[in-house]
């Protein structure tokens, strides 16, 4: 699969360093191989030059003319409904989860650790029961408990059949 995230007019990027860290910006113009002119009218980013080393390119791109003014960038941004698309993207969800994790206090971390321990205990029990029920070659093993239940069920059915015949 070829590379598809090019530095181009309309490409949406996420600032990774500096005062704009975490904000989305649109590339308006490429100044040189290291710098671009960015604008983020709906994310509170004024039009300014920004280093490419401090940007992460996203898969999103909005259509507007080369070196368009801020009002046209704003219009294209709102028409593309970029905010909603970004909120459901895995990248955004992961960033929000990292933010939530970093804001946990000591008691929240304890509750999380306790819940994980409980979940893992349930998973281990379920795995071990399945492991007991299978042989080394992968075929299901009939346990004594299963055999007893099956015999009881057959007796119950046999009793009904015998009663029906009489």
Curated annotation (Swiss-Prot):
GO terms for molecular function: RNA binding; structural constituent of ribosome. Residues 135-166 are annotated as: Disordered. GO terms for biological process: cytoplasmic translation; negative regulation of neuron apoptotic process; ribosomal large subunit biogenesis. Keywords: Ribonucleoprotein, Ribosomal protein. Gene3D superfamilies: 2.30.30.30, 6.10.250.2270. It holds the Pfam family Ribosomal_L14e. SUPFAM superfamilies: Translation proteins SH3-like domain (SSF50104). Residues 146-157 have a biased composition (Basic and acidic residues). GO terms for cellular component: cytosolic large ribosomal subunit; cytosolic ribosome. Belongs to the eukaryotic ribosomal protein eL14 family. This is Large ribosomal subunit protein eL14. It comes from Drosophila melanogaster (Fruit fly). The gene is RpL14.
